[in-house]
Amino acid sequence: MDLENKVKKMGLGHEQGFGAPCLKCKEKCEGFELHFWRKICRNCKCGQEEHDVLLSNEEDRKVGKLFEDTKYTTLIAKLKSDGIPMYKRNVMILTNPVAAKKNVSINTVTYEWAPPVQNQALARQYMQMLPKEKQPVAGSEGAQYRKKQLAKQLPAHDQDPSKCHELSPREVNEMEQFVKKYKSEALGVGDVKLPCEMDAQVPKQMNIPGGDRSTPAAVGAMEDKSAEHKRTQYSCYCCKLSMKEGDPAIYAERAGYDKLWHPACFVCSTCHELLVDMIYFWKNEKLYCGRHYCDSEKPRCAGCDELIFSNEYTQAENQNWHLKHFCCFDCDSILAGEIYVMVNDKPVCKPCYVKNHAVVCQGCHNAIDPEVQRVTYNNFSWHASTECFLCSCCSKCLIGQKFMPVEGMVFCSVECKKRMS
């Protein structure tokens, strides 16, 4: 398929999750409706991951595409119908007998994801070492956490040009090369193993002064070192604390098998969240989630959340923006050369600010223009003018004067306060 056809096929998937309720805003949101180029809901401005959208198949396709053309093809299966790679997510079902007065019932726990290891006891140990609120038990807070992290850490628009907004053929080509590069140089999946088993598989490299590994002296020294090593504790690469004997650890092949992590410590070095499904990116001796690895390589547009592959983009408020996406967060009007105000780290044009966000003057009860000076005390504001910031009793101007605030009113003296009480 040539680049022009790829560009034509692009779309953000506006039908996915349409009308789904927002788990954060509740009834304040009318239901999920994807903005035409931002990755947020048009109604409540929250991301798709904050809505109750059933995306298991879509997420499995996304991760399947991530593992395509990598050494992790054992974790994917291609559908016969369309040839799209699907993530073979390992689901673990545990059954525990529960004693009752008359008979024994079975309690079933389903984990929506579990480490792909043959030893189920090891997988169960791994799960128990995670914080309870992050264990991906179906229908639980932990399952919702995993779903949210899949969306946050591994955005589809960081690997698939068809999920991006109006890329040029040149940008599509650059993105494909970028994805190919990080798949070959940084992408990895953690291994859950017992440290003692790893020692048997991967011999330690030892520096023995004054002897060669093949000499009897060297062999004796190695045996001493081996015995000594068995007595020592393994330390987590993240927290530096010792691993308990018999507890599973996580290894990352790209980091080298001399490093290991507690299950709860296998986190992104930027956002410090658990690396979802143990999918990591390794760079400069650090673990990253997909999002923050890409952020370390490319600028990301604060408007559409996509990586920027264009040579021309703008920087404002310590953030990067596609030229066409430096827009008002409320009405989407382009802000280049216009007055804007930052509201919760989002740029808003002056008309929208006055209409939707401006504070109201306690004196004249009109919105306060962002360019006009004002006086603020607690949650109350006034125009800093002789017409507005006045004693509520005698109308004396209080600019530069001492005043007594009382429930939105201000007084110049105790006497004036008493007159109004």
Swiss-Prot record:
GO molecular function: zinc ion binding
Lipid biosynthesis in keyword set: no
Primary residence: cytoplasm
InterPro entries, per the entry: LIM1_Testin (IPR034958), LIM2_Testin (IPR034959), LIM3_Testin (IPR034960), PET_domain (IPR010442), PET_testin (IPR033724), Pk/Esn/Tes (IPR047120), Znf_LIM (IPR001781)
Any GO BP annotation: negative regulation of cell population proliferation
Residues in PET domain copies: 92-199
Lineage: superkingdom: Eukaryota
PROSITE patterns: LIM_DOMAIN_1, LIM_DOMAIN_2, PET
Keywords: Cell junction, Cytoplasm, LIM domain, Metal-binding, Repeat, Zinc
PANTHER family: LIM DOMAIN-CONTAINING PROTEIN, TESTIN
Domain comment (free text): The N-terminal and the C-terminal halves of the protein can associate with each other, thereby hindering interactions with ZYX.
Function: Scaffold protein that may play a role in cell adhesion, cell spreading and in the reorganization of the actin cytoskeleton. Plays a role in the regulation of cell proliferation. May act as a tumor suppressor.
Family as reported in the entry's similarity comment: Belongs to the prickle / espinas / testin family.
Protein's name according to its UniProt entry: Testin
Species in which this protein is naturally found: Nomascus leucogenys
Gene: TES
